[in-house]
Structure formats: structure tokens, C-alpha cells
Amino acid sequence: MTQLADLRRTYVLGSLNESDVAGDPIAQFKRWFDEAVTAKLPEPNAMTLATVGADGQPSARIVLLKGMDEKGFTFFTNYESRKGLDMAANPRAALLFHWVQLERQVRVEGRVEKVADDESDAYYASRPLGSRLGAWASEQSREVPGRDVLEQRESEYRAKFGENPPRPAHWGGYRLVPTALEFWQGRPSRLHDRIAYRVEADGSWKIVRLSP
């Protein structure tokens, strides 16, 4: 087995100073996200979503960012999945973007809310047919006897709905409204740059540097 203690790299690609960042964290995120897209990183909108259930047990998984503006970060999923149940019990959640090739991370913390039905409807309608049928066929996070059961359900819903399945009531969007963001840039000697934004009582953002 590979010696885990020997797996390391030196970070040399960039730096991040307080004078470099935008005054608004969403503008700063858009700047970095656009650079990740320009660099042709695979799935730059992939993010880890961390939630905590009613029992206090945390869990995390990769989801895809599907919208982002001054209101927050939007993603879509099954409301009855583990993450959906977690967020119903505890709306506090966190996101993590890791753009390895750029030696960058972005952490986002905040509260999650469901988006309006028309927003969920519009995104659902834009998905490929297979994905729309999959939202019906999968009772997400529940045990299933085998893959053949999923494929049978998908076939049944395809026969039922044809080319125009409606959005299931149990599927839709969430928006994480941020209260804190951190931008991390790898640096040599593990003295990484960490610039954090924290929302103030008046809605403005305070920018601070954190020790690595």
C-alpha cells in the first residue's frame, strides 16, 4: 500500500491578498468560478454539501451547483433523501468547492431554504428525459433490492409519462443563503492564504485573514 504520510505536494500556483479580493463575496466567487471554467476543470460546479440530521449526525456528499446570484447558491435534489430530511430538521449547511488544479478551495456556510416551485419547475423541464424519469424512479437514500428494480421503475414511468413527465412533488431546489465564505489559496510551506467574509448585523461583509 502507498505510504500515506509520503503523499504531499508543494503549492506554488498563486497567492491571495486582502487587496486582491472583491468587496462582495459573491463577486469574488464568480471571479474564481469563471477562472475554473476557463481552465477547463472537470465539473467546476461540483461541490460537497454537508448537512446535520436531527440526531446530530453529520453527512456529506457531492452535488452540483445549478444557480448562483446575490441571494445564494442553488442546487436540486429529492426532498425525501437523507440530505433533504437533514435540511428539513436543521437548515444550517455548508458547501465546499475544491478546484485541485488551481490549488483553491471555497467554503460556504449558511442556511438553506427551498426555492419557489416555478424555479424548480423550470430547472426540471430543462433536464434530459432520463434524468427527469430518474427523479420518479429513485426513492433516494432508501434500500432497493437490486438495480433491476430501478430500471423497471424507470420503464414504468416512461410508459406512463412518455416524453413529458411532470416534476415530482418530492423533488426540487434549495438555495443556501450564505452567512460566511472562505477563499483558500495554496501557498508554499503550508502558509496558505485564507481570506474569509463574515456577514455583519447590518448585512455588510467583513473581510478578514485567517491563519493557515
Swiss-Prot record:
Q: Which residues cross the membrane?
A: none
Q: Where does FMN bind?
A: 61-66, 76-77, 82-83, 105, 140-141, 184, 194
Q: What class of enzyme is it?
A: oxidoreductase
Which keywords accompany this UniProt record? Flavoprotein, FMN, Oxidoreductase, Pyridoxine biosynthesis
Keyword Oxidoreductase present in the record's keywords: the answer is yes
**What catalytic reaction does the record list?**
pyridoxamine 5'-phosphate + O2 + H2O = pyridoxal 5'-phosphate + H2O2 + NH4(+); pyridoxine 5'-phosphate + O2 = pyridoxal 5'-phosphate + H2O2
How the cofactor binds, per note? Binds 1 FMN per subunit.
The pathway is: Cofactor metabolism; pyridoxal 5'-phosphate salvage; pyridoxal 5'-phosphate from pyridoxamine 5'-phosphate: step 1/1; Cofactor metabolism; pyridoxal 5'-phosphate salvage; pyridoxal 5'-phosphate from pyridoxine 5'-phosphate: step 1/1
Which residues are listed for substrate binding in this entry?
8-11, 66, 123, 127, 131, 190-192
- Cross-referenced NCBIfam families: pdxH, PRK05679.1
The UniProt function text for this chain reads: Catalyzes the oxidation of either pyridoxine 5'-phosphate (PNP) or pyridoxamine 5'-phosphate (PMP) into pyridoxal 5'-phosphate (PLP).
**Protein name, please?**
Pyridoxine/pyridoxamine 5'-phosphate oxidase
Q: Which organism is the protein's source?
A: Cupriavidus pinatubonensis (strain JMP 134 / LMG 1197) (Cupriavidus necator (strain JMP 134))
Gene this chain is encoded by? pdxH
